[in-house]
Amino acid sequence: MEPFKIHILGCGSALPTLKHSASSQLIEMRGKCFMVDCGEGAQMQFRRSHIHFSKLNAIFISHMHGDHCFGLMGLLSTLGMLGRTSKLRIYAPKDYEPLFRQQVEFFMQTMEYEMEMIPVDTEKQQVIYEDHSLTVETVPLQHRVPCCGFIFREKPTLPHIRRDMIDYYGIPVSQINNIKNGADWTNEDGDVIPNARLVQPADSPRSYAYCSDTRFMPALKEQVKGVTVLYHESTYTSEQEDRAKIYYHSTARQAATIAAGAGVGTLLLGHYSARYNDEKVLLEEAKAVFDHSILSQEGMVFDVV
């Protein structure tokens, strides 16, 4: 099974604190590296992750609030100073495109790599990135500005070859791909060896949904149904539920309600309000509804399995 890792660079909310950095994550999957949100200081957290800047394939911005995007221009500038030459695609809400182009023209005139912004319609659930091994789709969220989440999904892989059976039946290497794709094997005596005897089931495709920032959306459980890991903002406890509704955020209990209803494997909590010196109160509230809840923390590397 190939590595599928979530690096938490920042899990705080809008008000800066000495404890938490602004929202940002790195997703490692299928040999690629994607950044989700890029709050102020994200590139410093990037360095602490021990992932080389050159491995960054694309950046996805959920919405245009500063704690999710103020680090973008600094990061793009650093990539240029480090000698990046390959194109970098930035997926962000479509309203950002004019400002993005102005910022690039003003700050990035000497950069020797191409930056392409892909405008995203945050009101549609759609695949915005696809390659041979994975897809990234948007999930509309309810916030004070256009906002969407992202679901990273592995594509199904071929079954695993049973090496013992290949050796036992003397099947040549040239036939391995055919067998992986479902072919039976006929030996010299004309006996047909069924494919099921020659392979083991493929690993189940894994998935990760990132949902921040959003008001409580009961319907969201259908959009993230069955994902392996769900990151859902948990800015407040239930004592601040009215405040969460006003500012289009969620409580830890509401995040856990989505996780339980969607049947996800694990819930990662994050986007903590600066009012909480100890986020355990958020964790306790979430675990009362969904036991497989975890507090995200800067420096955490979570394996999606």
Where are these regions (language model features)?
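Conserved beta-strand hairpin/beta-sheet module of binuclear metal-dependent hydrolase folds
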Residues: 1-49, 85-87, 150-152, 200-211, ...
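Short, surface-exposed connector motifs at secondary-structure boundaries
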Residues: 30, 56, 82-87, 261-268
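Active-site neighborhood of phospho(di)ester-bond hydrolases with catalytic His/Asp-centered motifs
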Residues: 36-39, 56-64, 93, 208-214, ...
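Active-site metal-binding motif and surrounding structural segment of the metallo-beta-lactamase
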Residues: 40-91, 119-121
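Hydrophobic packing residues within well-ordered alpha-helices of enzyme cores
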Residues: 46, 72, 100-103, 220, ...
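A glycine-rich helix N-cap at a beta->alpha junction
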Residues: 107-120
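Metal-dependent phosphodiesterase/nuclease catalytic metal-binding core
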Residues: 121-269, 278-284, 289, 305
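Conserved phosphate-binding/catalytic loops in two-lobed NTP-binding clefts
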Residues: 291-299
